[in-house]
Regions:
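Glycine-rich N-terminal segment of FAD-binding domains in flavoprotein oxidoreductases
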Residues: 53-81
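ATP/nucleoside-binding phosphotransfer catalytic cores, i.e., glycine-rich phosphate-binding loops
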Residues: 2-7, 22, 219-315
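Class I SAM-dependent methyltransferase SAM-binding "motif I" and its flanking Rossmann-like core
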Residues: 157, 164, 168-212
Length: 637
């Protein structure tokens, strides 16, 4: 199955670079791999080496959550291949809710389902700070002290890190002297964990967790992190000083600690943001653009005002030596960036396209926009969508998942009440009973999911009708099976998902495909959907129509492509910004209060506008024309 990674284009030349230089900006050395699977495989081998060398009992500490799951799979594979045995291993988990809930809502459910159930570990060698009922203060204190004594001095501790720097349930302000204890969970923790429960009211408010001092007693510590969502915290604990508001930073004091991260989690580290400050680089045209844009941000100047002194003072002497003089670099990068701007995302007919991002022919083009959820198309590239339709292209939009779990029960009842008032039948009480039958931690009833899916389909069709698209012939609701679990945890992507996409692509045979270029959660819906499309394309290799097909990547509501990577920038007029906003409004079930809003309190239309307006501002500051907003894309191939 295809894995989504962006092709490399220039960067730090690490071959032969001394380790001390490579990690020169890092307080915790970072081992960076292409994706979470590659990092987990290497880490699993390191763990296996430690276990196999140990003559006695090997004591391994593991964190909860989703970050260790790829590691579990790699360890299970090594076990099945006979390269590791857990018969002499003790496993210590760093936390659990107090009192411990049912197994399917336990903090350690993935540990059991993905690791312990598949290896030869002795049940008595699994240590979890788990109490099934509330005890008196003296008893629970004794339990914590006993667990802490056993968990002190672990051979190895492997932990994922939360986006706010929490490790386990050690949140901002936790003492570096803390030991295993009962913890009253703050609202932020409960909100974060509520996705595994019916609502925040059902989410536990207490836990038992290992303290920072206990963690620091381990002989060796490995931190792990995957996806762009973790990039900011990875930068903080890797390069920034200790900060009590980021508990993971206390681990910088450990003498034997390092991190295993993927390229997306490492994206904000200096050796990725400004690798010329670390060592020699490969200077490709896009990488030169990246460096010049970075330099403009440092000195607060447009491209054509940069001086030789600016380059030299900011570590870009090698660039001058290989590609100077500076005036030539400035002009080349200015022209390169200016040529990304095009108001014709499908190509301008009968025009010189030698410097345009999209060829003029064929015209019109057949286009497929893949939208992971039923609103990602208008949120992420609504302005470009408008232009493609209005400029006469045959545009199709494919909604990959139903998005049904992201609809509040109250929204369903409101729609049923409206249907009753309009005389289309009375199912209000029936649906109310279905909602009342829901059980915390269990999948939603299929009948309810079907209603929620119908609501989102109607909203999506309404939005694209406002662009002039025929919602009967050019809207495709794929309902990929991996998504239809009825809960937050989705199924694995399978060939059944791929086949649905292949059928659509063969039907349309597009010249352009637009995909969500999401680099965040490796197992999130956006990433899974994009990888499903790429796998479908891979299986279609050899089809004649693919020779003239190009794939363009857009970003979501929160993040944007850095200008060093951009291949096409589509400017939006003030009227197009308003038209896009009104299309987002059509998604009423997502407009104000949604079940899983994340940390950003802004509505989707606000996020989308601020993101595209900020991109326009960056182009303006670099010396380009000033636009109301700009949507940018990266060309995958």
């Amino acid at each position: 199955m295809s894995k989504f990674t962006l092709p490399k284009d220039g960067g730090l030349i690490e071959a032969g670079l001394p380790i001390g230089i490579k990690h020169s900006y890092e307080r915790i050395p970072a081992h960076i791999y292409e994706d979470e699977d590659a990092a987990s495989e290497r880490l699993a081998v390191k763990i296996a080496e430690g276990i196999n060398k140990c003559e006695g009992v090997y004591r391994l500490g593991l964190s909860t959550g989703s970050s260790p799951v790829p590691l579990y799979k790699s360890l299970v594979r090594l076990h099945k291949e006979g390269k590791i045995s857990f018969s002499n291993v003790e496993i210590f988990c760093i936390d659990e809710y107090y009192p411990a809930p049912a197994d399917n809502q336990s903090r350690n459910r993935r540990l059991y389902s993905d690791l312990l159930a598949h290896v030869d570990i002795k049940p008595e060698n699994v240590h979890i700070p788990k109490l099934s009922e509330i005890l008196d203060t003296e008893s629970v204190t004794a339990f914590c002290a006993d667990f802490d004594a056993k968990a002190t001095g672990l051979d190895l501790l492997v932990m994922g890190v939360g986006m706010q720097g929490q490790i386990g349930f050690n949140e901002a302000g936790a003492s570096d002297k803390s030991r295993t204890r009962t913890i009253l969970l703050p609202y932020s923790s409960r909100k974060r964990e509520s996705k595994n429960f019916a609502n925040i009211a059902e989410t536990p408010d207490k836990a038992i967790g290992m303290g920072i001092s206990t963690m620091l007693s381990a002989k060796k510590i490995y931190l792990i992190g995957w996806g762009e969502d973790k990039a900011q915290i990875v930068k903080q604990f890797t390069e920034d000083p200790i900060d009590p508001l980021s508990p993971v930073s206390f681990l910088q004091r450990h003498e034997n600690i390092s991190s295993y991260i993927d390229e997306n989690a490492a994206s904000l580290l200096i050796r990725n943001v400004a690798p010329w400050l670390v060592g020699p680089c490969e200077w490709t045209p896009k990488f030169i653009r990246k460096a010049v844009v970075w330099l403009c941000e440092q000195v607060q100047k447009p491209i054509l005002k940069l001086t030789q002194g600016d380059y030299l003072k900011h570590g870009l002497g090698e660039l001058l030596e290989q590609h100077g003089p500076y005036t030539q670099i400035n002009i080349k990068v200015f022209n390169d960036l200016q040529h990304t701007i095009s108001g014709w995302p499908g190509g301008k007919p009968n025009a010189d396209d030698s410097t345009r991002p999209v060829p003029s022919s064929p015209f019109p083009k057949k286009v497929v926009i893949f939208s992971p959820h039923p609103d990602d198309d208008v949120i992420s590239m609504g302005g470009t969508f408008i232009r493609l339709v209005e400029q006469g292209h045959d545009v199709h939009v494919a909604y990959e998942t139903s998005g049904n779990v992201a609809v509040h029960d109250d929204v369903v009842l409101q729609h049923m009440d409206a249907a009753r008032e309009l005389g289309f039948g009375d199912r209000f009480d029936e649906v109310k009973e279905i909602i009342a039958s829901k059980k915390p931690g269990q999948p939603e009833p299929r009948a309810l999911l079907n209603l929620k899916g119908a609501i989102r389909r109607a909203e999506a069709k309404s939005a694209v009708r406002s662009f002039g698209l025929n919602d009967q012939t050019n809207c495709h609701f794929l309902n990929l099976p991996f998504y239809e679990t009825g809960g937050i945890k989705k199924g694995e992507r399978t060939q059944a998902d791929i086949d649905i996409i292949i059928e659509l692509l063969q039907q349309v045979q597009p010249h352009q495909i637009y995909l969500a270029g999401d680099l965040a959660d490796p197992h999130g819906t956006h990433r899974v959907c994009t990888e499903a499309v790429l796998e479908a394309i891979n299986q279609l290799k050899g089809e004649a129509w693919l020779e003239d097909c190009h794939v363009w990547l857009y970003r979501g509501a929160w993040m944007e492509w850095e200008l060093g990577k951009v291949d096409m920038a589509v400017p939006l007029s003030p009227d197009e910004v308003i038209k896009k906003r009104h299309a987002i409004y059509r998604h009423l079930s997502q407009k104000d209060i949604v079940p899983f809003p994340g940390e950003d309190p802004r509505e989707f239309w606000q996020r989308a506008e601020e993101r595209t307006q900020n991109t326009a501002r960056l182009y303006d500051e670099l010396g380009m024309a000033e636009y109301q907003a700009i949507e940018v894309f990266v060309k995958l191939f």
